[in-house]
Regions:
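Carbohydrate-active catalytic/glycan-binding domains of CAZyme proteins
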Residues: 1-302
């Protein structure tokens, strides 16, 4: 998240069981977390729920969670999404392991402290992977709905407010082909007036004929497809493809192109052009090394 002239990288901290933040002057880093506590932790007001006798609600194994049923694995304080609204107010969406474990909380302007208590929105089927986008004044809270036998779809709820009133649950993205029913994570973004969704499957793991179950589960390939909103504000279910989008425009070989603009490379490496500069150059070039650029328009030259 870019704000106050800084870039903020939020992450799940396994050591604290909460969500930390690292800060950098550049989007490419280096990022440093010099805070003495997580931004959101199990002790943050509203993260854990309490009964009428002010006792923390736990599952049958004694793990703090949102309900007392054995199917709840306990609160997962991770997978943060930070959204900055048009008025400058920042919110964090987080949680995991059970539909009752999603949370929303305001952030202060410094982006490293919370403002008030977390609230529990209505997120049927919620499992993990919180994400929020805004379209025509409506807020869309989407998430991985992989919950105990339920298909691992990307689902969503929508509201006129960023912290309450979420309704109309639906499926944005069905579990994609070549994903073997595993979970998913996603981002939704606008580029040149069009909306897209980024997610993952296991295509490369399958093409490499990975036999180990753990390798197939964790070797994930990034995918992008188009996303469309209906006139009533709801989101059309994405038509999931196997090969992704066509290249949006050709590469112009007669202008300066950064080194990471490549379809494939072998042997070479890239590095920053200079300290404090985000531009990259190709380095470590040896005999036999190559890079390939796809979709180049040479026009009448070349």
């Amino acid at each position: 998240v870019h704000r106050n002239g800084k870039f903020y990288l939020y992450y799940g901290d396994a050591n604290s069981g909460g969500i930390g933040v690292a800060v950098s002057d550049l989007p490419t880093g280096p990022y440093i977390d010099n805070h003495d506590r997580p931004v959101v932790g199990m002790d943050t007001p509203g993260v854990l729920l309490y009964d009428e006798n002010n006792r923390c609600i736990k599952n049958k194994k004694g793990v703090p969670g949102a309900i007392s049923g054995s199917e709840n694995w306990g609160m997962w304080c991770f997978d943060p999404c930070v959204f900055v609204d048009d008025d400058g107010q920042a919110y964090m969406y987080l949680g995991g392991a059970h539909p009752d474990n999603s949370r929303i909380i305001k952030l202060k302007e410094n982006m490293t402290e919370v403002d008030g208590s977390a609230v529990k929105p209505n997120t049927p089927g919620f499992f993990e992977a919180s994400f929020v986008h805004k379209y025509r004044g409506k807020y869309y809270f989407s998430y991985a709905g992989h919950y105990f036998g339920k298909p691992a779809n990307i689902e969503y709820v929508m509201s006129d407010k960023p912290m309450e009133g979420f309704r109309n649950p639906g499926v944005i993205l069905p579990n994609p082909p070549v994903n073997d029913g595993f979970n998913n994570h996603h981002s939704i973004f606008q580029f040149k007036g069009e909306w897209y969704i980024a997610y993952h499957n296991r295509k490369v793991a399958y093409e490499n004929n990975e036999q180990d179950q753990r390798s197939r589960e964790y070797m994930r390939s990034v995918c992008i497809d188009r996303l469309f909103h209906n006139e009533d504000g709801t989101v059309q279910t994405v038509e999931v493809t196997r090969d992704g989008l066509e290249q949006l425009k050709n590469v112009d070989p007669y202008r300066r192109n950064e080194a990471e603009t490549m379809a494939k490379g072998y042997g070479i490496d890239t590095e920053f052009k200079a300290r404090g500069c985000s531009d990259r150059i190709v380095t470590s070039i040896h005999n036999g090394d190559y890079l390939k650029i796809r979709g180049v328009d040479f026009k009448n030259g070349g």
